[in-house]
């Protein structure tokens, strides 16, 4: 996993939609820390801090030490970010408090590597991504920023399943009962046409003359 990030915030006194709107009018993003069998902590964050962290890999699976001005520091993960429907700006952030026994469920992005080492792609095959993310459950400190799928040697018609993905100890796929598909190498349209024509020719040759 990546290094633990740091965030700073100010506390706020009031909850509710009216208080959240007032926080936004002040140019801040309302937020809350909850979980860990403790009372929620109401916060306001500078928008630039959220934007900076969202541009980094593994934002949704990363641990943060969030320090409240004049208060304590909380170990947290981002649980949810709400966005404005028009501007797409963050308008509220939920943080989950992380304890020593906390486990979380998150979707981790999949990165594909060594595409140039795939004979199927070199022949014009198409990488058909079935899952852009893998939903996993586990300890926050064991979560990777992303999973890698190596396409070395992949031929047209091959399917790559979750069983070949390197998953850290302490992390497990939410779908555990089957080896689900991550991607396939599909035949290019030209090759499909050639194979179809060849199949039709073979069928015609095998048909007895009337």
UniProtKB/Swiss-Prot annotation:
Record carries keyword Cell wall biogenesis/degradation: no
Keywords, sorted A to Z: Ribonucleoprotein, Ribosomal protein, RNA-binding, rRNA-binding
GO cellular component assignments: cytosolic large ribosomal subunit
Segments for region (Disordered): 1-23
Keyword Coiled coil found: no
Annotated InterPro entries: Rbsml_bL25/Gln-tRNA_synth_N (IPR020056), Ribosomal_bL25/Gln-tRNA_synth (IPR011035), Ribosomal_bL25_b-dom (IPR020057), Ribosomal_bL25_C (IPR037121), Ribosomal_bL25_long (IPR001021), Ribosomal_L25_dom (IPR029751), Ribosomal_uL5_bac-type (IPR020930)
Single annotated GO MF: structural constituent of ribosome
SUPFAM superfamilies, per the entry: Ribosomal protein L25-like (SSF50715)
GO biological process: translation
Record's subunit section: Part of the 50S ribosomal subunit; part of the 5S rRNA/L5/L18/L25 subcomplex. Contacts the 5S rRNA. Binds to the 5S rRNA independently of L5 and L18.
HAMAP family: Ribosomal_bL25_CTC
Family per similarity comment: Belongs to the bacterial ribosomal protein bL25 family. CTC subfamily.
Role this protein plays: This is one of the proteins that binds to the 5S RNA in the ribosome where it forms part of the central protuberance.
Name of the protein described by the UniProt record: Large ribosomal subunit protein bL25
């Amino acid at each position: 996993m990546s290094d633990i990030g740091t965030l700073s915030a100010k506390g706020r006194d009031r909850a509710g939609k009216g208080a959240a709107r007032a926080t936004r009018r002040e140019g801040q993003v309302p937020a809350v820390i909850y979980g860990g069998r403790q009372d929620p902590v109401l916060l306001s964050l500078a928008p630039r801090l959220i934007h900076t962290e969202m541009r980094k890999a593994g934002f949704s699976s990363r641990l943060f030490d969030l320090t409240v001005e004049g208060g304590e520091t909380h170990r947290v993960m981002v649980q949810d970010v709400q966005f404005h429907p028009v501007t797409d700006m963050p308008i509220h952030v939920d943080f989950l408090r992380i304890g020593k026994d906390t486990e979380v469920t998150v979707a981790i992005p999949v990165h594909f590597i060594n595409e140039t080492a795939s004979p199927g792609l070199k022949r014009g095959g198409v990488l058909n991504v079935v899952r852009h993310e893998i939903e996993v459950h586990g300890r926050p400190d064991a979560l990777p920023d992303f999973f890698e799928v190596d396409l070395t040697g992949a031929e047209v018609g091959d399917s790559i399943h979750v069983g070949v993905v390197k998953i850290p100890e302490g992390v497990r796929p939410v779908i555990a009962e089957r080896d689900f598909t991550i991607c396939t190498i599909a035949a290019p349209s030209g090759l499909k046409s050639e194979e179809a024509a060849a199949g039709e020719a073979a069928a015609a040759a095998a048909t007895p003359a009337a």
